[in-house]
Amino acid sequence: MAEPELVNGGVKENKLWKGVFAVSGIMSTLVIYGVLQEKIMRVPYGVNKEFFKHSLFLVFCNRLTTSAVSAGALLASKKVLDPVAPVYKYCLISVTNILTTTCQYEALKYVSFPVQTLAKCAKMIPVMVWGTLIMQKKYKGFDYLVAFLVTLGCSVFILFPAGDDVSPYNKGRENTVWGVSLMAGYLGFDGFTSTFQDKLFKGYNMEIHNQIFYTTLCSCVLSFTGLILQGHLLPAVDFVSLHRDCLLDIALLSTVATASQFFISYTIRTFGALTFAAIMTTRQLASIMLSCIWFSHPLSWEQCIGSVIVFGSLYAKNLLNNKKNSQTQPPPPELPQYEKVESS
């Protein structure tokens, strides 16, 4: 009897270390990503205090890095690079993903990172709308209640900013109406992207690296074309060649963005979407706190209440979902089956 207990203990310890790896990977990469994107878009470079204005160039660099790494992962695992789904479906995800990321970067010119991060929590509503339209999903009353509370908390956070914002990076740049409009575009496009990705995974038997590779490859082509058509490619290259610290920031941003993609995929595959949602909620809270400290963003008491409403609702939803999931799940499989799942 001692041997099975020893085996089960080893499995639990292995799962624990995988959890530590997943949490530390997601938290570190995405928190660094958040700080870097705010620095690039809101902090001036050089003695002349010039701002980096070419958000599409950031999208291109991020997607180029991710597509190269995902191609390397496919080749290293000796898997074919042939597309599993029709190419136009990858392109559709790419277009909405580019629009999502561009709105995200552009919004940082007009609203602070804490406002943007908390507003991202309101993506539940567009996801529910797109899920109903595209996948004919049905949601319960509790889901709508959580979505309403999160939206309410986000609205309070945006509408009641601190009156004595001492951040030197906000002066003359705040425009709540335009910033909120860009965030609304971000939420709409992001909701469609995630819902259509879900539909693509369920409709085709594809590896995560396959979807990442073709989606980011299409994004590279589209963003590069957009830079040329807008005439922003050479100005962006001139800016980063003149300001080497900006080039370093963009390189690091692309690196952590790529790393976060694979940590996210690993976490969802190993622990499921519910655990991933709880980790992401914690990451958003940590990002807001770090941004407030790093870039001197004060929070009003109304914003603190809004934050409590948002994160309290999200944690309550995750807790209830985990409880419901544990009650409906069958007993854990024996060790040979567990090893088979982990190696797939």
Swiss-Prot record:
UniProt membrane topology term: Multi-pass membrane protein
InterPro entries with a match to the protein in the record: SCL35B1-4/HUT1
Compartments where located: Membrane
SUPFAM superfamilies assigned to the protein according to its UniProt record, in alphabetical order: Multidrug resistance efflux transporter EmrE
Region (Disordered): 324-344
GO cellular component, one term: membrane
PANTHER family named in the record: ADENOSINE 3'-PHOSPHO 5'-PHOSPHOSULFATE TRANSPORTER 1, SOLUTE CARRIER FAMILY 35 MEMBER B
Name of the protein this chain belongs to: UDP-galactose/UDP-glucose transporter 5B
Organism: Arabidopsis thaliana
Taxonomy of the source species: Eukaryota, Viridiplantae, Streptophyta, Embryophyta, Tracheophyta
Chain's gene name: UTR5B
